[in-house]
């Protein structure tokens, strides 16, 4: 009885070690997958503001955001130069660089997320619709010049398609 329990205890301990090890490996994998993306985002320094500005596509909002984005770009450029030097120096400084990149990314996201995401979503929805409407109307006009009767059918198809989109 004592031998069977001791064996089962050792087996349980081995199983625990086996289960803990892949969890640690999974955590390392997730950190590896996220941190190089963030370091690569911070390294070009142009990608981080572009990702914030590209969905906007509004000139008025770019004017409002360029002030904050220029500040973030200047901060990102500072970290880029630091990170470029850190890559030459040692691997031990990379985690500090990653933390700095996270600190730079998150305040911009926090500042951008609350007021900007709602505005972004509104303009994301409206602007592609306008583009699609222009795309739909121009071929309809061409069809109208070619054939007036099928053009009416095409306009109905275009409106249905735009509603689906």
UniProtKB/Swiss-Prot annotation:
Which residues are recorded as modified (Phosphoserine)?
83
Superkingdom of the source species: Eukaryota
Q: Where is the composition biased (Basic and acidic residues)?
A: 9-18, 68-89, 118-157
Record keywords, A-Z: Chromosome, DNA-binding, Nucleus, Phosphoprotein
Q: List, in alphabetical order, the Gene Ontology terms for molecular function in this entry.
A: DNA binding
- Give GO cellular component annotations, separated by semicolons: chromosome; nucleus
Main location per the UniProt record: nucleus
Q: Where's it found, cell-wise?
A: Nucleus; Chromosome
Q: Where is the composition biased (Basic residues)?
A: 20-31, 103-117
- In this chain, composition skew of type Low complexity spans 32-41
Post-translational modification summary for this protein? Cell-growth/division-associated phosphorylation by a CDC2-like kinase. Is additionally phosphorylated on either Ser-33, Thr-34 or Thr-35, and on either Thr-39 or Ser-40.
- As stated in the Swiss-Prot or TrEMBL entry, residues carrying the post-translational modification Phosphothreonine are 48, 54, 117
- Segments for region (Disordered): 1-165
The entry's function note states: Histones H1 are necessary for the condensation of nucleosome chains into higher-order structures.
The protein here is known as Histone H1
| Taxonomic lineage of the native organism | Eukaryota, Sar, Alveolata, Ciliophora, Intramacronucleata
